[in-house]
Amino acid sequence: MKVAASSLRKGFVVDMDGKLYVVLNVENIHPGKGTPVTQLNMRRISDGVKVSERYRTTETVERAFVDQRDHTFLYQDGEGYHFMNPESFDQLVASPEVIGDLGAYLAEGMVVQLSTHNDLPIALELPRTVTLEIVETEPSVKGQTASSSYKPAILSNGVRTMVPPYIAAGTRVIILTEDGSYQERAKD
């Protein structure tokens, strides 16, 4: 469906020359003289190349229809990451390029938001937090509880993060999936 370039927002998916792009940033520029323009910074979904385009605010852009649904992560193999729609039991395979760094946080049975275009996965949204176990970290030093310094730790998924000094190996912690940072100790 055609929409005015000025109405696009961050996260929208547009179809340009048969390729899909996700909008990263939109800036409406109104110069003192001349026509107002909309500056779009986008990323091509197929290969991750970043593109910058300028449109007059009256020009139209083809907005792609994207279907967002909950899917359950099943497993990963040589083909890619396998997901199942819990309502229809249809299975989809997402390529490693679509999943990117988020694959480290996927666990069997995890429910995620999968965005598809013509039944092809194009984007993944994880839950805000995940609970993981610390497998390796430096031992805590007595008397260091009052300092605000953090120490490096390796999580059960292989990701490195910084944790407070009182956290020991074997402790289950809650991690923010957007940046991999420590949130709090798990209460289980």
Curated annotation (Swiss-Prot):
It comes from the Bacteria. SMART domains: EFP (SM01185), Elong-fact-P_C (SM00841). GO terms for molecular function: translation elongation factor activity. Pathway: Protein biosynthesis; polypeptide chain elongation. The keyword NADP does not apply. Keywords: Cytoplasm, Elongation factor, Protein biosynthesis. One of its GO terms (cellular component) is cytoplasm. It is found in: Cytoplasm. One of its GO terms (biological process) is peptide biosynthetic process. Belongs to the elongation factor P family. It comes from Caulobacter sp. (strain K31). This is Elongation factor P. InterPro entries: Elong-fact-P_C, NA-bd_OB-fold, Rib_uL2_dom2, Transl_elong_fac_P/YeiP, Transl_elong_KOW-like, Transl_elong_P/YeiP_cen, Transl_elong_P/YeiP_CS, Transl_elongation_fac_P. The lineage of its organism: Bacteria, Pseudomonadati, Pseudomonadota, Alphaproteobacteria, Caulobacterales. The keyword Ubl conjugation does not apply. Involved in peptide bond synthesis. Stimulates efficient translation and peptide-bond synthesis on native or reconstituted 70S ribosomes in vitro. Probably functions indirectly by altering the affinity of the ribosome for aminoacyl-tRNA, thus increasing their reactivity as acceptors for peptidyl transferase. It holds the Pfam family EFP.
